[in-house]
A protein has these predicted regions:
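Iron-sulfur-associated redox domains of electron-transfer enzymes in respiratory
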Residues: 326, 343-344, 378, 414, ...
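N-terminal small/glycine-rich loop or linker at the start of catalytic domains
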Residues: 4-28, 76-79, 288-290, 296-297, ...
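Anionic ligand-binding catalytic core segments
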Residues: 561-581
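Short glycine/proline- and acidic residue-enriched helix-loop micro-motifs
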Residues: 401-407, 564-566
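Flexible, glycine-rich loop/tail regions that form catalytic "lids" or insertion modules at the edges
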Residues: 1-28, 37-41, 47-49, 100-101, ...
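Short conserved micro-motifs at the rims of enzyme active sites and ligand-binding pockets
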Residues: 378-380, 540
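Glycine-rich phosphate/ribose-binding loops and adjacent secondary-structure elements
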Residues: 16-147, 153-162, 172, 177, ...
Length: 585
């Protein structure tokens, strides 16, 4: 390379040195040792490019996680005023998707060589006897896909170039100790501490054992199950057991047993009730009919889910006195004024389906600033789901993919939001106006601003909510648990003497009465449910909503598949009846 002093075209600008990120014991000491080695080479050898390489993994050598290595070295080089002298390149097998690349760049990496990802592409295609040119094309396509994902991540934050995104630290860090945050991710937001260096090293040792010693695993590489449930892999709350329990609505006590028996998978699972009050008769507790009024269906558009599912939810919610939500896809005017009418009409950045008649048919108008399933992005409906009817409802063209802009282009300040709230109240003076926010660190400040803009209700949407149309890259690593955002918003509103002005709602993964009660104790006054309702209507959690191939007719516009829809209004009502009774008990 041009950085090799023995090369004919040597240029000191490219002078580089490779540093292994392997270690034997003591993660923290190894990080500091690696940093000192890097710093000495920069100061003494005048290198311009630092290559952090994790290809030296062996039976005796473990690897420092690349985000820790990048973050630690980048941060300490800046502290010692030598960061500007070098570029940091990560030669790593840890980057396999846009998120993992974004983490390294945001915490200081200048460039990334994801060798394992490229090797996987070659390995996957070598059996097809492709020409060298075709194989190179596959690798380039992979690179284009990762770059496209990076651009989407940057666009969510309003950033146009990688140079601006680098060193931005635009992440909320959940579950790492204050010491690690201070050492490696100083500028990142962190509200919930957790693993220390010793804890991470134990996990590294376990993975190392599985790779080099444990011969009882079924596959050479663990499948993981990040997006889809795999037995023994990543935990999914809507796994087979809970999905089956929800489907058996006549015995929802089984669902309650599963939820309460899970091993602390969510923040709320760490909360135990503490009270010195004596039990009271259930006859003295708020009635089911009153509790029903606090229940809402989460926003799911007629388009992301089928007409049959959308109408069943609306009828069920209207029957019990709750509220269904149209989502951002408009609604058939023939449903207005009937049991099929959604009390909540959503107004999103794309304004799909928004007409004066649509707005005046609502009891509540919901401005979607963000949603838990894919915060920072607008709604997305693949063209395959936009049939003639959906196109008519949304006033668009059949077969064309519909993507709402990430921001509302008429909202760039609290004053702009106040203007939209005012305009909506002029169209429908009887409706309450709500603003939907996503749970994130700092949402409390935003909630206070929304209250000052005269919104009637604020919704805190958690990351555990589902989605009927989002691509896979939007499902993971976006948004925080509603528990964090709800507590922050509630406390911020109280601190600013605004809490009594607004109603607060929580949504995102609520399933049982204990979830509702814990949300209430954190400040929520009403509660929205999405995925459980679709599961009751027949959803099998296949995670193919975006393909328009839902085999049970819940999340598809394919007429043949919609004929297989077997959900009923009665089953939904049974679920909410169980839920309200569970809350009372």
């Amino acid at each position: 390379s041009y950085g090799d002093e023995n090369h004919d075209r040597y240029d000191s600008y490219y002078k580089n040195k490779t540093f292994s990120t392997s270690f034997k014991t003591n993660l923290k000491v190894s990080l500091e040792s690696l940093y000192q080695e890097v710093k000495n080479s920069i100061v003494n050898d005048k290198i311009s490019i630092v290559l952090l390489d994790d290809r030296s993994l062996s039976s005796s050598e473990k690897l420092i996680p690349m985000p820790l290595a990048i973050g630690y070295i980048n941060q300490h080089l800046k502290s010692d005023n030598v960061r500007q002298s070098v570029s940091i390149v990560a030669v790593t097998g840890e980057v396999y998707d846009p998120h993992s690349a974004a983490v390294l760049i945001a915490f200081g990496a200048t460039a990334i060589y994801p060798y394992m990802m490229y090797s996987s592409v070659i390995s996957h295609n070598e059996r097809k006897n492709l020409s060298e040119k075709a194989l190179i094309k596959k690798i380039k396509n992979t690179q284009i896909s990762i770059n496209g994902g990076l651009m989407k991540i940057m666009s969510k934050m309003g950033i146009a170039t990688v140079a601006s995104y680098r060193n931005s630290s635009l992440f909320d860090v959940i579950g790492l100790s204050d010491e690690i945050i201070s050492d490696c991710f100083e500028k990142a937001n962190s509200d919930l501490a957790g693993l220390c260096y010793e804890d991470i090293e134990k996990r590294i040792e376990l993975s190392h054992f599985d790779a080099f010693v444990n011969d009882k695993t079924m596959f050479p590489l663990e499948m993981g199950g990040i997006y889809k449930y795999i037995d023994g892999g990543e935990y999914h709350d809507f796994g087979p057991a809970i999905t089956k329990a929800i489907n058996h609505t006549k015995d929802l006590k089984g669902l309650k047993t599963l939820i309460e028996g899970r091993d602390k998978k969510f923040i709320r699972d760490f909360f135990d009730f503490k009270s010195d009050k004596k039990e009271i008769s259930i006859d003295n507790v708020e009635s089911k009919n009153e509790i029903f009024k606090r229940f809402a269906a989460a926003a799911m558009s007629c388009g992301s889910i089928s007409v049959e599912a959308h109408e069943a939810i609306a009828i069920a919610m209207n029957t019990i006195g709750g509220s269904s939500n149209s989502g951002e896809g408009g609604e058939d005017a023939a449903r207005f004024g009937t049991l099929k009418n959604s009390k909540i009409k959503q107004v999103a950045s794309g304004r799909f389906g928004v007409t004066p008649a649509y707005l005046r048919s609502a009891d509540e108008l919901q401005i979607k600033v963000a949603q838990g399933a894919k915060p920072g992005e607008g709604g997305q409906l693949p063209g395959s789901k936009v049939n003639a009817m959906i196109a008519t409802l949304r006033h668009t063209t059949e077969g064309v993919t519909l993507i709402s802009p990430p921001p509302h282009h008429d909202i760039y300040s609290i004053e702009d939001l106040a203007q939209l709230i005012f305009d909506l109240k002029q169209v429908n003076p009887k409706a309450t106006v709500t603003v939907k926010l996503v749970s994130t660190i700092g949402v409390g400040t935003i909630a206070a601003g929304v209250a000052k803009a005269y919104a009637d209700k604020i919704i805190i949407s958690g990351a555990d909510g589902g989605t009927g149309a989002a691509p896979l890259t939007s499902i993971k690593h976006t948004g925080n648990a509603w528990e964090l955002g709800l507590a922050e918003a509630h406390n911020s509103l109280k601190a600013n003497h605004l809490r009594e002005m607004v109603h607060v709602q929580a949504d995102g993964g609520l399933k049982t009465g204990i979830d509702v009660v814990k949300a209430a104790m954190l400040g929520a006054e009403s509660y929205a449910f999405g995925t459980p309702l679709l599961t009751i209507l027949g959803c099998k959690i296949l995670r193919i909503c975006h393909t328009n191939k839902c085999s049970v007719g819940v999340a598809t516009q394919n007429e043949e598949l919609r004929e297989k829809f077997s959900g009923t209004v009665e089953r939904l009502i049974e679920y909410f009846d169980f839920l309200a009774q569970d809350v009372r008990e």
